[in-house]
């Protein structure tokens, strides 16, 4: 069984293939906003930055933790942020590019969004939540399962966030709320009916996810005014 950092080494080819797709999408968005020359100047830097960050992604259980992919995906956005900040681009513009990339990917690949309101998946999430509270890995999320009450199929209260921890280590706290906002298109494209009023990254004491399949997504965000 692959353990600790060996996991990322064993999966590097797959993760970097996914990163190539990310680069195609953000490259088009960067060119649209800043021009072809700027895109050509920075894309190589973004790829090198991701290679550096990739080597520092904390192990949180590998394939046994469904949030591992979220952490790797966030590292892609972090590479984008770090490079564009060096070119003095404001966080609002970087965040807009990152959000648009995520929105495009989710709309084009809605079939890949986990069926988070399906009863079998809800049971899996409940078990995962219990395991997260053991805090086996310092870079992981910790979250509590909230049983359904009629109004919601179920909820999750995140009290620790792996993305927030990773971004804090890289002095990217101002960028974290844009990753929170990406839950909006995920809910819309997956028909998850997410309601959320606060996040850790935006000053809350938890991220209060509440799911109800089929209803309208309503997510409070300090950076994206939508949903």
Regions found by a protein language model. Give the residues of each.
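Short, conserved micro-motifs enriched in small and acidic residues
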Residues: 67-71, 174-181
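Hydrophobic, Leu/Ile/Phe/Ala-enriched alpha-helical segments that form helix-helix packing faces
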Residues: 30, 84, 132, 183-186, ...
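A short, structure-level motif marking secondary-structure boundaries and short turns
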Residues: 64-66, 167-170, 219, 224-226
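N-terminal, charged low-complexity regulatory/assembly segments
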Residues: 1-84
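Amphipathic interaction/junction segments at domain boundaries or subunit interfaces
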Residues: 72-170
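Non-catalytic recognition/regulatory regions in large multidomain proteins
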Residues: 152-157, 167, 172-179, 197-202
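Short coil/loop linkers at secondary-structure junctions
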Residues: 37, 90-91, 173, 193
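C-terminal structured interaction module
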Residues: 177-227
